[in-house]
Amino acid sequence: MGAMAYPLLLCLLLAQLGLGAVGASRDPQGRPDSPRERTPKGKPHAQQPGRASASDSSAPWSRSTDGTILAQKLAEEVPMDVASYLYTGDSHQLKRANCSGRYELAGLPGKWPALASAHPSLHRALDTLTHATNFLNVMLQSNKSREQNLQDDLDWYQALVWSLLEGEPSISRAAITFSTDSLSAPAPQVFLQATREESRILLQDLSSSAPHLANATLETEWFHGLRRKWRPHLHRRGPNQGPRGLGHSWRRKDGLGGDKSHFKWSPPYLECENGSYKPGWLVTLSSAIYGLQPNLVPEFRGVMKVDINLQKVDIDQCSSDGWFSGTHKCHLNNSECMPIKGLGFVLGAYECICKAGFYHPGVLPVNNFRRRGPDQHISGSTKDVSEEAYVCLPCREGCPFCADDSPCFVQEDKYLRLAIISFQALCMLLDFVSMLVVYHFRKAKSIRASGLILLETILFGSLLLYFPVVILYFEPSTFRCILLRWARLLGFATVYGTVTLKLHRVLKVFLSRTAQRIPYMTGGRVMRMLAVILLVVFWFLIGWTSSVCQNLEKQISLIGQGKTSDHLIFNMCLIDRWDYMTAVAEFLFLLWGVYLCYAVRTVPSAFHEPRYMAVAVHNELIISAIFHTIRFVLASRLQSDWMLMLYFAHTHLTVTVTIGLLLIPKFSHSSNNPRDDIATEAYEDELDMGRSGSYLNSSINSAWSEHSLDPEDIRDELKKLYAQLEIYKRKKMITNNPHLQKKRCSKKGLGRSIMRRITEIPETVSRQCSKEDKEGADHGTAKGTALIRKNPPESSGNTGKSKEETLKNRVFSLKKSHSTYDHVRDQTEESSSLPTESQEEETTENSTLESLSGKKLTQKLKEDSEAESTESVPLVCKSASAHNLSSEKKTGHPRTSMLQKSLSVIASAKEKTLGLAGKTQTAGVEERTKSQKPLPKDKETNRNHSNSDNTETKDPAPQNSNPAEEPRKPQKSGIMKQQRVNPTTANSDLNPGTTQMKDNFDIGEVCPWEVYDLTPGPVPSESKVQKHVSIVASEMEKNPTFSLKEKSHHKPKAAEVCQQSNQKRIDKAEVCLWESQGQSILEDEKLLISKTPVLPERAKEENGGQPRAANVCAGQSEELPPKAVASKTENENLNQIGHQEKKTSSSEENVRGSYNSSNNFQQPLTSRAEVCPWEFETPAQPNAGRSVALPASSALSANKIAGPRKEEIWDSFKV
């Protein structure tokens, strides 16, 4: 029966142990532990291993005190081989040590009992022992008979011990001691042991050797410790619980001995076997076995123990519980301890990881300290095995992580940045000073040509473009990154927006191919267009700033970190898609500027500003493209110093160059003269164009300002324009004067044939006459007078030839419209002229006052000036204000090109000259006396004709320039090259001696039909008949003493001339009736001119004046009105002349005797007027719409002098 019960009991026991182990493994999750299990002895031991943190430290540089004690004990008490094995786990070191018994690590710091619940690898062994102990206690307490039959139940106990090793692989040995006696027995009666040897379990019955357990040693402490510790404190409430109650208690593990606090843990130890330590650290876990006395009081019966192998159990020195807990040497303020798993039962299995901002000063490139592994050997003294104290050093400022003492952030070059910001501040200061300088010289022509407001706007925008360098000098922040975009975009829009709009204005004004007038783009209009551009930029910047603020609310920062190739960190403003959009917008805007530069490439300018602006735009386009490419591609790798230098170079290569291109030429040209050809210079600012009432946008202006056109095309266009103007002039003339419609005569063919015969005179005659004029001008005063008296026919013959040559040139000249040319020159320009020119300009003032009193100039003045005015057609027809400004400060030699003037200036000039004429008439003899002295120069009268005055007055005085010198003077080679007039031919009628004689005759008496051409209507008023022409200077102002000397010779001749004119007055009135309309004007003019002194050199041409006048009159046949109207007008003029002649008879009688030699030439002229009266007719034209084109040659003076002389010649005929 017993043999059959043994296997059955063994199966039940194994089943119970297996269920107990499984339940133990599930118990921590299935149900909570009892209060005694959670807090045994009032100390918590159920904590999981964790990291030591800085909060555990009590001092800033604190480290574990237990670690220091452990290190001291290991160095002092533990043998070196044992300590080396404890640190490395190397068994070779341990085998060399000798021993006589086992070695325990007793007295070392750490909470030893707590390891059972703390270390997870020991939980299974503890649970197995607990279930086995509880099972045995239940069996002994439920059946008292088991205690009496120990020998019979040995198989049960051996099966129980074997099941412990079989159920838990970490248990290397299990033993059980049992005694029927209580504490009185010194040694147990039964001692059974099971040992694991490699892959098999060895059962041993050591009952015979049990008495040695009676001695209390380290090996028997597991037995004596529990026996001494036993105290009967467990009592049952009821004696008769029965098997049901015991089973319930067993399931709840609250039976006798079921509490884990009744287990005993031994220190880790090494077994000594055969005089040497056996490798592998062991720990003994023992538990007491209890039985019941007859009074149901628990009684100690034995001990069950297991030896657990710790070689695979890790030591957690970072934990607060367990063996060697808290014995790490990490400084908790700058590092933290991290255990290393899987190394086994060795010390130093942890890492001291440096916290953020600290680094380990070791040679390893990691921020931790790792203890020596188990494969490393330790040699030397005991100090080598002691754990070292490691300190993590702080990183450089601003580094969150570092591996050594090297800086992690880019180190800025302070001296370089200081030099850059200093130079930038200097440039900004110079820019501000430039604004003040430009405002100071705001009245200068170079500044006004560009516009003061526009230049100041460009300089202010440049100041904004200088700010990005200043912003990048400081550490990046959100505000500075936003300000960087604002300064860049606003500055770019201001500077290059203004430059582009200036180019746009040049394109609209100077290259307009339409004849319609468009509003001129003034500086105010350009500023309004710039305001629109800036408004768009403002709207974009406000939207971008709003998006940035919204991103900041979403924790999206505008500041980022870049890393260089050396792994150095630097802060930077992040580049987003908005930056790409702004770069593309700048590029497109500059492309528009490049197009405008190409469009205005042919436009001339006073200071070449469009050319410099084109260079600035192209420079900005190229440099900005390179800058944005580098910025977008290499921004994350360019440190702050490189980025600062990149912005610095971009700023000065674009902004500084732009300022230099716009300002340096203006101030460099201020000391030098601009180009001489001011007519081709195009000014871009207003230049008082609004007040002058003229805008430079007509078809002629646009055609002449574009050099790409063919001159032949321009000539054809001008011819068409002149024809249209002529048709419009005649239409307006007929509308205002209906009676002129009947004056068109069909006999114009006769006049044309006569003109054709006159123009067949060869040109050699005019050249010969010009040479004789030059020779005659070089003689002295007395000799010149003698030659005049001896050879009057020869000089008159030469004069006739030269007059015919002049008419020939005039016929073949281009028929021009009556456009008004500017003839005034600035005072400063006169000062730079030749000495003779300045003297002639002074005399021109006096001559102008005398001629204005007559209210008319001769038709000869218009015809002769037309012949050469074609050479002075400017390439750009500018307004009067523009001409005045362009020649205001010019000091170079005068140009021969004439400048057109608007009607508003002509009207103002008429009013001024009429007022001067009135003063001249009332002044009388006193005014003529003052005319011999230098008069103050009029800025509006002598501005543009100093050169012409010099040419025309060369005949009266020897010191003046000769006719041969005139071709060497610079002349404007205009587009009308075929109509150029020979200067010698044009001046051939002004030989020495002839000019003085012409001044003493009234042109109304010699050629009254020429005077009628200047008369607009039947009753011309002073406001209509006054022409806006400049008059040549007289010889009186140059040689006053000489002219007074010749007065006595002039007066008798003038008197004879007046006598002859009285005889022919009635006949002339019958033939030329139309001259009576303007007779009042001729009388006043004759009164002043007849009293003008005559120079001796001019006496040579007395006899030649009448035929030449006749020839000139023959050339006017194309514009003669019908004969009937001419006769009526002539009678009226003759009546008025007769009335006026009574008042001036005294002066005429003095002059009459000196011109007797010219009476032979009077009769042919009178006969011609009687036979061909239609040739002396001319249509009346309103002077308000006409003006005389005055070239810069000698034709101006010739026409001016010829008028009064012809009038006195006619008086001499009548006398």
Swiss-Prot record:
Cytoplasmic face of the membrane: 440-451, 502-525, 598-611, 665-1215
Domain observations: The Cache-like region shares similarity with the Cache domain, a well-known receptor for amino acids. It acts as a ligand-binding module that recognizes and binds glycine and taurine.
Residue list for modification Phosphoserine: 694, 705, 708, 865, 946, 1080
GO annotation, cellular component aspect: cell projection; nucleus; plasma membrane; postsynaptic density membrane; postsynaptic membrane; presynaptic membrane
Keyword Secreted: no
Species, as recorded: Homo sapiens
Protein name, per record: Metabotropic glycine receptor
Result of changing residue 540 to A: Does not affect ability to regulate cAMP levels
Function: Metabotropic receptor for glycine that controls synapse formation and function in the brain. Acts as an atypical G-protein coupled receptor that recruits and regulates the RGS7-GNB5 complex instead of activating G proteins. In absence of glycine ligand, promotes the GTPase activator activity of RGS7, increasing the GTPase activity of G protein alpha subunits, thereby driving them into their inactive GDP-bound form.
